[in-house]
Swiss-Prot record:
Entry's Gene Ontology molecular function annotations: catalytic activity, acting on a protein; transferase activity
Coiled-coil annotated residue ranges, if any: none
Family affiliation: Belongs to the class-II aminoacyl-tRNA synthetase family. HisZ subfamily.
Function comment: Required for the first step of histidine biosynthesis. May allow the feedback regulation of ATP phosphoribosyltransferase activity by histidine.
UniProt record, GO biological process: L-histidine biosynthetic process
Protein name per UniProt: ATP phosphoribosyltransferase regulatory subunit
Cellular compartments per GO CC: cytoplasm
NCBIfam families to which the protein is assigned, alphabetical: PRK12294.1 (NF008947)
Organism: Staphylococcus epidermidis (strain ATCC 35984 / DSM 28319 / BCRC 17069 / CCUG 31568 / BM 3577 / RP62A)
Self-association state and partner proteins as the record states: Heteromultimer composed of HisG and HisZ subunits.
Predominant location: cytoplasm
Lineage top rank: taxon: Bacteria
Gene3D superfamilies the UniProt entry points to: Bira Bifunctional Protein, Domain 2
Keyword list, A-Z: Amino-acid biosynthesis, Cytoplasm, Histidine biosynthesis
């Protein structure tokens, strides 16, 4: 037990030290967020079902369940001159405490964020002594590009998320692009996608660029996910999920966001 605790703390410390050496600003935020009723958005209120909230006197508090969301909210209200930050700490999900390390880049040009990925990959390989086994790649504009607005009902979106082909066929017909893509192996779906999206569509450009970049850097097992729906309205672009070879519970996830703040985040559960 003692060795496990020490090992986890050492990983967090080595992460922060490494990224500090790579010129990231190390930041530390309280696990408990104090929220301002006057600034809560409709989306914030919808999160109450998935977060631990409580009220004390005239203030409302919540336990952090997502670092990107916390930093997005904070830096939207209090703009920072930091261009890229690194963090380590706890998040609370489904009443479980999870250790997470991650980075945010507030200058999310392609060359910058691919370098962020390489930094993270170096940490995984040389500190965790692990490696990326395969990648799931997607884009939060795909659903809008492939599915007509009148079909984007709650029922249909749930069937897409569940990959319920039989139900979708009854609603959309067999020849619908969503059906034709989902019935293929996820390793082949990127090729199929090109039949239904113009080559210059922003989602297609982003997915192709990342897919080619990963291939050029030796990661060739790339699965497409056309079912993903943005967890927050400010997630509007590419998303990445990387599964590791030796630790099934450790997943590197990331994505582009643009709302009151623009950035790209990567987070790894330890």
């Amino acid at each position: 037990m003692n060795n496990t605790i020490i090992s986890m703390k050492e990983k967090e410390l080595r992460f922060l030290k490494f990224f500090h050496q790579q010129k990231y600003n190390v930041v530390d935020f309280n696990l408990i967020e104090e929220l301002d009723w006057q600034r809560l958005t409709h989306e914030d209120l919808q999160q109450m079902d998935e977060r631990s909230f409580w009220q004390q006197n005239k203030s409302i508090y919540a336990l952090r369940n997502d670092f990107t969301d916390q930093l997005f909210r904070y830096y939207s209200n209090y703009p920072t001159h930091f261009k890229k930050v690194a963090y380590a700490g706890d998040i609370i999900r489904d009443n479980r405490v999870i250790k997470q390390v991650g980075i945010e880049n507030y200058e999310p040009q392609f060359d910058n964020i691919t370098q962020n990925f390489l930094d993270f990959q170096y940490f995984i390989q040389n500190v965790l002594h692990d490696d990326i086994q395969f990648i799931i790649l997607g884009h939060y504009q795909l659903i809008d590009a492939l599915l007509e607005k009148n079909h984007q009902t709650r029922e249909v979106m749930e069937m897409i998320e569940e990959r319920n082909l039989s139900g979708l066929i009854q609603t959309l017909t067999f020849n619908h692009p969503i059906i034709q893509i989902l019935k293929e192996n996820t390793l082949n779906q990127l090729k199929i996608l090109s039949h239904y999206l113009p080559e210059r569509h922003p989602a297609m450009v982003a997915i192709q660029s990342w897919s080619q970049w990963f291939t050029d850097h030796g990661i060739t097992e790339i699965h497409l996910d056309v079912t993903a729906q943005a967890p927050r309205s400010y997630y509007k672009g590419i998303f990445i999920k990387c599964h590791l070879k030796n630790t099934a519970h450790s997943v590197l996830t990331g994505g582009y966001y643009h709302g009151s703040l623009e950035g790209f985040g990567l987070g790894l559960t330890l």
